């Protein structure tokens, strides 16, 4: 298992390994806007081309992976940002009662794209149908689109200094011609450049501890608590409190001396890293003070600070005199926090490894620096393989994902090296449907459309005698009742598992315990019978003894 980094510049695209020196270039790749590249599972890479109404599709896995363009998808107009809404990891077959894993050729449910004017497109990828177009999603260009909570919600940010949270079902609903956002955040005063969502997520926003971090050119970082969005019960119970059930709660605001371009969070939500024109800085969200005291910066300090949140100012450690714990306590009392400088460069994009130990920093010179967070040392620098470094431009997209080493530990297999099948001239026969330009009329019930979808392999072999709740609920209840009675049996249960021909044969000692119980019951019955017989014999003996004693007395 290794990690690969995918980054694009104004004139090139590169795929490299984080822990090795393997590297390849993507052909005919040109981007000018950030977040214009999105990875579709572990198979495809979508890149919106600069100054062209076109999406280039690259194949990154299997025996068909290539450096050249796999497929081109024409668009109604030029797109700036891309995002996909993935399918769930397991699909349930109601007829067979079997869970199916996702197949190799698996397309996401939705593809979202934005334009320079703030228009939002929503396509269904399995059919290519244009489900909806939101003409004025933002007043200006959208800077980022992200789906959260398994695609239930969509978050967009734009140059109009707003962050909008949408519900996915509203965007794709055929009966909703003009979808309304769930909430709008307009605390920033300049364009919002980036945002990140915490890793602590659940099924719905109202029952999770999801936090949203937004950064802007106004040199501020704002953290919101999204757990109160859409909570109607809390809204009715607290009608006087405007912070409940309507908009996210602003937990904290961090001000910096520089305009912020990018932000990335630690996988465990312990720290955040921001990229500016003056370098990359790290901020610990669990701030350490004198001794062993640690302060949670995202915890509300009181009732009066719920609406506006706490405000902190970030200062560099090297600008302090000494930088000891006593200075940190004094600065914290004044609302100032000390942040570490990771790298001095003009940062354009940031990304972090899956274990949170490495920080990938993309700059305006077209280079990606891999830095160790603990030591703040540059491990290696990745550049585009080209002869003219001056024309590369800045890093516009930066992605990381794990992958398995296959085919002799080759990261990427070029078109000339790969052993392609003899059929179809070595090309993948599974193609992505073309994206339509006209909105699908969902109100016409007789208007049907085809969806090409491949079903994966069953997740596991199921026992035919095993009742499922969707098939036979009464039988399922009886089965659960039997299992509960077995596991609640008095005494310890010791199981012996034997593996024969890759099949598990489990024999439990419950049967032997039941046999022992029957023997004990039978023994108790026998003992009672013997006791009763003994009492009768004793009574007879006492009577005979009394008669014998009387006969002796008469003599």
Swiss-Prot record:
The answer to whether the entry has keyword rRNA processing is yes
Localization: Nucleus
Subunit details: Component of the RIX1 complex, composed of IPI1, RIX1/IPI2 and IPI3 in a 1:2:2 stoichiometry. The complex interacts (via RIX1) with MDN1 (via its hexameric AAA ATPase ring) and the pre-60S ribosome particles. Interacts with RIX1.
Q: GO cellular-component terms in the record? A: nuclear pre-replicative complex; nucleoplasm; nucleus; rixosome complex
- Write out the entry's keywords from A to Z: Coiled coil, Nucleus, Phosphoprotein, Repeat, Ribosome biogenesis, rRNA processing, WD repeat
Gene from which the chain derives: IPI3
Quote the SMART domains the UniProt record gives.
WD40 (SM00320)
| Stored PROSITE patterns | WD_REPEATS_2 (PS50082), WD_REPEATS_REGION (PS50294)
**GO biological processes:** DNA-templated DNA replication; pre-replicative complex assembly involved in nuclear cell cycle DNA replication; regulation of DNA-templated DNA replication initiation; ribosomal large subunit assembly; rRNA processing
* Region feature (Interaction with RIX1): 460-504
What is the designated name of this protein? Pre-rRNA-processing protein IPI3
Q: Where are the WD repeats?
A: 29-68, 90-133, 137-176, 187-234, 255-296, 342-383
The record's family statement is:
Belongs to the WD repeat IPI3/WDR18 family.
């Amino acid at each position: 298992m290794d990690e690969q980094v995918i980054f694009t510049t104004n004139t090139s695209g590169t795929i490299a390994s984080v822990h090795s020196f393997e590297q390849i270039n993507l052909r005919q790749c040109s981007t000018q806007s950030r977040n214009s590249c999105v990875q579709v599972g572990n198979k495809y890479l979508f890149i919106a081309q600069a100054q062209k109404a076109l999406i280039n599709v690259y194949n990154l896995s299997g025996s068909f992976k290539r450096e050249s363009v796999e497929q081109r998808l024409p668009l109604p107009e030029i797109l700036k940002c891309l995002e996909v809404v993935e399918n769930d990891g397991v699909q349930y077959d109601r007829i067979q009662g079997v869970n199916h894993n996702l197949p190799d050729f698996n397309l996401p449910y939705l593809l979202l794209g934005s334009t320079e004017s703030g228009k939002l497109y929503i396509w269904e990828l399995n059919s290519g149908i244009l489900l909806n177009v939101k003409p004025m999603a933002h007043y200006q260009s959208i800077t980022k689109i992200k789906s959260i909570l398994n695609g239930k919600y969509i978050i967009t940010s734009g140059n109009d200094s707003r962050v909008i949270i949408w519900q996915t079902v509203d965007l794709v609903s055929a009966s909703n011609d003009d979808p309304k956002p769930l909430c709008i955040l307009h605390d920033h005063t300049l364009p919002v450049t980036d945002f990140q969502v915490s890793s602590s997520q659940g099924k719905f926003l109202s029952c999770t501890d999801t936090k949203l971090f937004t950064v802007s050119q106004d040199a501020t970082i704002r953290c919101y608590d999204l757990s109160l969005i859409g909570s109607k019960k809390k809204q009715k119970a607290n009608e006087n409190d405007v912070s409940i059930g309507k908009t996210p709660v602003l937990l904290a605001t961090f001000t910096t001396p520089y305009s912020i371009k990018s932000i990335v969070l630690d996988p465990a939500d312990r720290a955040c890293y921001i990229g500016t024109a003056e370098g990359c800085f790290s901020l610990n969200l669990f701030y350490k003070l004198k001794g062993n005291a640690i302060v949670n910066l995202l915890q509300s300090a009181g009732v009066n600070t719920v609406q506006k949140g706490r405000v902190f100012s970030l200062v560099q450690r090297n600008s302090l005199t000494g930088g000891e714990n006593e200075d940190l306590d004094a600065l914290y009392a004044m609302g100032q926090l000390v942040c570490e400088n990771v790298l001095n460069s003009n940062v354009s994009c940031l990304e972090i490894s899956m274990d949170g130990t490495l920080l990938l920093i993309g700059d305006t010179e077209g280079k990606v620096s891999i830095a160790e967070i603990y030591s703040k040392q540059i491990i290696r620098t990745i550049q585009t393989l080209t002869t003219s470094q001056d024309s590369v431009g800045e890093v516009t997209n930066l992605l990381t994902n794990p992958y398995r080493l296959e085919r002799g530990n080759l990261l990427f297999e070029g078109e000339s090296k790969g052993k392609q099948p003899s059929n179809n001239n070595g090309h993948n026969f599974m193609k992505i449907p073309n994206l339509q330009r006209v909105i699908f009329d969902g109100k016409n019930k007789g208007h049907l459309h085809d969806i090409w979808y491949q079903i994966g392999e069953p997740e596991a072999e199921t026992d035919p005698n095993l009742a499922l709740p969707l098939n036979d609920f009464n039988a399922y209840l009886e089965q659960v009742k039997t299992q509960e009675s077995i596991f609640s049996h008095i005494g310890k249960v010791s199981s012996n598992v034997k593996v024969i021909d890759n099949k598990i044969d489990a024999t439990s000692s419950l049967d032997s315990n039941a046999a022992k119980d029957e023997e004990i019951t039978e023994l108790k019955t026998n003992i009672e019978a013997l006791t009763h017989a003994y009492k009768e014999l004793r009574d007879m003996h006492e009577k005979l003894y009394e008669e014998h004693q009387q006969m002796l007395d008469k003599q």
